[in-house]
């Protein structure tokens, strides 16, 4: 208690930390922010391309996030299933409020990633610049072959270990904070329905999607 009082007097406040991998290369991040991304943005404008930011994530029934209210001195109790199950999704967002997503079974592989790329290609007639992380599946020969045969989508890669630079990461956080622990889930199907309902709600609200780009770490992409 005394330490907390001192911290308050010194101007410190309790805040949710931003996690940063020690493997991250700060020079690569600087290069991305000052050179690489501005070049992508200029090229997109020149070619009439839409820039999207993509990512994969898993939502687990036992994930614990967010807070709940209760009388002072009493810990809130949330009734949830003791079973463990999950739902995997891949999504993409842009700073105009567009949201694309797909639920998939099992781990991400080249076939699943290509299936999502096909969905993106069908969503518009023009060129798409998709910015993603350096997951090996994004660089497989199958993916490269598909991209060569379907030239309307180009992939660009974020600096390694830099999820905080990806606006789509804040969609992932939004889902996990507002699904697990806030809806009753007795099965994987319940979780899947909850995730789809939430994503469709966000898809219908472009202004909410745009807010992901307000975070200080991704404001450069707004």
What kind of feature is each model-predicted range?
Residues 1-24, 50, 57-59:
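Conserved short alpha-helical interface segments
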Residues 140-150:
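Short, aromatic/basic amphipathic alpha-helical patches
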Residues 26, 133-134, 156-179, 189-191:
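RNase H-like two-metal-ion nuclease catalytic core shared by retroviral integrases
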Residues 2, 47-49, 169-222:
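C-terminal anion-handling pockets and recognition modules
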Residues 18, 75-81, 149-167, 183-184:
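RNase H-like polynucleotidyl transferase catalytic core
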Residues 31-118, 216-220:
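Extended, low-complexity cationic-aromatic segments
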Residues 126-139, 166:
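Acidic/histidine-rich, metal-coordinating catalytic segments
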Residues 3, 55-57, 91, 117, ...:
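Generic structural signal for small/hydrophobic residues in well-ordered secondary structure
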């Amino acid at each position: 208690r005394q330490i907390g009082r001192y911290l308050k007097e010194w101007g410190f406040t309790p805040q949710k930390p931003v996690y940063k991998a020690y493997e991250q290369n700060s020079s690569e991040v600087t290069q991305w922010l000052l050179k690489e991304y501005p070049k992508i943005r200029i090229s997109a404008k020149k070619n009439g391309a839409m820039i999207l930011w993509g990512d994969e994530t898993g939502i687990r029934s036992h994930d614990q996030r967010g807070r709940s209210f209760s009388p002072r001195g009493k810990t809130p109790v949330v009734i949830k299933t003791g079973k463990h199950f999950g739902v995997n999704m891949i999504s993409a967002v842009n700073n105009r409020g567009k949201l694309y997503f797909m639920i998939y079974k099992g781990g991400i592989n080249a076939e699943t990633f290509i299936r999502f790329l096909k969905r993106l290609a069908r969503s518009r007639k023009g060129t798409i610049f998709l910015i993603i992380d350096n997951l090996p599946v994004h660089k497989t020969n199958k993916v490269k072959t598909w991209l060569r045969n379907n030239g309307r989508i180009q992939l660009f890669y974020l600096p390694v270990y830099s999820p905080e630079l990806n606006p789509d990461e804040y969609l992932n956080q939004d889902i996990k904070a507002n699904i697990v622990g806030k809806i009753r889930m007795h099965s994987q199907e319940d979780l899947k329905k909850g995730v789809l309902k939430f994503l469709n709600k966000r898809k219908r609200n472009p202004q909410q999607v745009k807010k992901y780009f307000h975070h200080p770490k991704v404001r450069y992409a707004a």
